[in-house]
A protein has these predicted regions:
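N-terminal cap/lid segment of alpha/beta-hydrolase-fold proteins
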Residues: 1-29, 81, 152-153, 158, ...
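Short beta-strand element of the alpha/beta-hydrolase
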Residues: 30-39
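Short beta-to-alpha linker loops that shape the active-site pocket of alpha/beta-hydrolase fold enzymes
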Residues: 40, 63, 68-72, 143
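Catalytic nucleophile-loop/oxyanion-hole region of alpha/beta-hydrolase
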Residues: 45-47, 67-102
């Protein structure tokens, strides 16, 4: 397995795990990639939802990557979303060299990472409409409910305000 560590805008990183071709399957070189987006309430990036998950997908035959995105005060102004778009773009940019199927890139997001992954598939942020999007989503307990039942701490971290009206 090859390991690559890429720097992203705003201090984010993308850790990429590329499977090697094996003798038993010499014709299986190009593979889909699962980009794991850990949760953490936009206060931290959960270690248990990152590399361990990516390595399970790698064991199942996928190339994988883990996004370490901006959190806390740094998460404002859609920086995590821009970092996600940059990560998807880098994977597609290197797809041929890294033996990745560029039209088979999935995001696997947990909690706040699920919110970020879903946002990456449907974002409608001015200036980001043409950013790369995933081909598939796997969402595990995503933070997607706002209003009365919201995980308020995640939305406060993301928006920078305690005002509940801003979270609806």
């Amino acid at each position: 397995m090859q390991l690559k560590q890429l720097e992203l805008a705003g201090g984010g990183t993308l850790t990429v795990y590329l499977r090697d071709c094996c003798e038993r399957m010499p014709n299986v070189l190009d593979r889909p990639l699962v980009l794991v987006v850990p949760g953490g309430g936009y206060t931290h990036v959960s270690p248990r939802e990152g590399d361990p998950v990516a390595l399970q997908f790698a064991a199942a035959g996928y190339h994988t990557a883990v996004l370490h995105y901006a959190v806390g005060e740094s998460a404002r102004d859609a920086l995590p979303m821009r970092q996600l778009a940059q990560a998807i773009g880098l994977v597609r940019q290197h797809a041929e060299r890294w033996n990745i199927l560029p039209d088979k890139i999935a995001l696997c997001g947990f909690s706040a990472g699920g919110h970020l992954a879903l946002s990456g598939a449907v974002w409608d942020i001015p200036g980001m409409a043409d950013q790369p999007r995933p081909n598939a989503l796997l969402l595990a307990y995503p933070v997607v409910t706002a209003g009365e039942y919201a995980h308020r701490d995640s939305f406060v971290q993301l928006t920078g305000t305690q005002d509940i009206a801003a979270h609806q």
